[in-house]
Each structure stands twice: as C-alpha cells, then as structure tokens.
Amino acid sequence: MTSLFTAAILGIVEGLTEFLPVSSTGHLIITGHLLGFTGEKAASFEVAIQLGAILAVVVLYWSRFWGLLFPKPGQQFSGIRGLYLLFLTSLPASVLGLLAHDFIKQHLFNPYTVAWALGVGAIMILIVEKKETTPSCFTLDEVTPKLALGIGCFQCLALWPGFSRSAATIMGGMLLGAKRKIAAEYSFIAAVPIMFAATGYDMLKSYKLFTMADMPFLAVGFIVSFLSAWAAVKGFIYLLGKLTLRPFAYYRLALAPLVLFFWS
C-alpha cells in the first residue's frame, strides 16, 4: 500500500492536528499530496488511523468516560445525563454527515476546498476571540443540554474538510458561554463518539480496499497517531491556560494561500 515511513508521517500529522483547531483532514490531504499518497484508499487509510487519536483522548480522560458508564456522586457530567449531552452534541453532524457523506468524499477532499476552509475558519476564530464573551460555564459539570446541542450545531461546520472539528466546537462553546479550556475539553470528549461512528461507517464502506498486507501500515499509523495525539492534547490544554486561539488562526491564514498557490 505504502511505506512504513509514509504511514508514520501520516500518523504524526493525524495525531498532532486532530484535536488542534487547524484541521487534521486538511493537513492529511496536503501531506498525502506531498508524499504522492492520494486516492480513495489513501483517504480511507487516513480515516482509519483516526482511531489512534480517539484512543488517546479516551486514555487521557478515562475517569470521565468511566463516569459516563458508572456515575460518580456529585458529578453532573456523568451517567445518563452525560450520555444525553454527548448525544445532543453528536446528533446534528451525524445526521448531516450521513446525508452528505458521498458528496463530501467526492467533491470536498482536495487542496483547494481545504485552503478556503482554513481561511474561513481562521477569520471566524479571530472574530470569536475579539468578541470576548463572558463565560458562564466553568466546568464540565456545568454543561447544559442547550450548550451541548449548540456545540453540536457548530460541529456541522467540520464536515467541510479543512475547517477543523476542534475549531468549530471550541468556537461554538466559547460563543455560547463556555470558558476556553472547558470548551476544548468538552470538544475532545464529545469528539470520541462521532469520530468513532464516522470512522466505523467509513471502514464498513471501504474495508474491501485493504488486505492483510496492509495491516502493518495501518498498525504503524494507528500507534504513531495515538502517541502524537496524546502529546498534542496534553500540550494544547496547557497552552490554553496561557494563550488564546489567535496563533492558530494566524497559522491557518498563512497556510491557506500557500496551499492555493502551490496547487493552482
């Protein structure tokens, strides 16, 4: 299918960018073009190694996920209520994603649409940071059904490859009253069910593209993606205590025209 080196590079890119507001899909498309790894099988490989990044979040927030199954006294984001909040957040993008899956795969997975998504997302990040909404939600236990559903609606923006699911949900959370760090942490946790569902759905449709000979490459991509995502999430949460999202917006603005110029 590809070299182990290519699989490792894609795993690093996936893990480092999946939960940052810079678009993992966009970076994977760009990296794939640079490495000469493109096409339907390449796109499915990139989706498959997302499982490594998903697992990293499950490990980092294991106590929260455990609390969803076995509620802890005094925690509001746990048990049936916590699962209900995640359901509300996952619902809008899940429905729209199922309806538009084939269109997105056929028409939006290319450097040009990604470049525009990077630019539009950057401008929106700067607008949200300038707005400086006064937070009303300071912990995960203060997330309300209204906030969860609102974040879910913003998550639909991430169906445009290059926009970034993390950017969409963190911006949405901030606009709707969540503190920046809490918006990010909720974004990470809420990503798990929808990313797992999207990855599973894609693999059900494309598993015939892979053979046993591809397993080493998938394994390398998965493991490297897990390790990179673990480091990226830890670092990002630390930085959010000191920085805004503006540096990520400037990075996106710098990258977008370069992508358009390079592939025009």
From Swiss-Prot:
Belongs to the UppP family. It is an enzyme of class 3 (hydrolase). Bacitracin is thought to be involved in the inhibition of peptidoglycan synthesis by sequestering undecaprenyl diphosphate, thereby reducing the pool of lipid carrier available. It is found in: Cell inner membrane. The keyword Glycoprotein does not apply. Pfam families: BacA. Catalyzes the dephosphorylation of undecaprenyl diphosphate (UPP). Confers resistance to bacitracin. The lineage of its organism: Bacteria, Pseudomonadati, Thermodesulfobacteriota, Desulfovibrionia, Desulfovibrionales. The chain crosses the membrane at residues 15-37, 42-62, 84-104, 108-128, 143-163, 182-202, 217-237, 243-263. GO terms for cellular component: plasma membrane. InterPro entries: UppP (IPR003824). GO terms for biological process: cell wall organization; peptidoglycan biosynthetic process; regulation of cell shape; response to antibiotic. It comes from the Bacteria. HAMAP family: Undec_diphosphatase. It is a multi-pass membrane protein. It catalyses: di-trans,octa-cis-undecaprenyl diphosphate + H2O = di-trans,octa-cis-undecaprenyl phosphate + phosphate + H(+). Its EC number is 3.6.1.27. Keywords: Antibiotic resistance, Cell inner membrane, Cell membrane, Cell shape, Cell wall biogenesis/degradation, Hydrolase, Membrane, Peptidoglycan synthesis, Transmembrane, Transmembrane helix. GO terms for molecular function: undecaprenyl-diphosphatase activity. This is Undecaprenyl-diphosphatase.
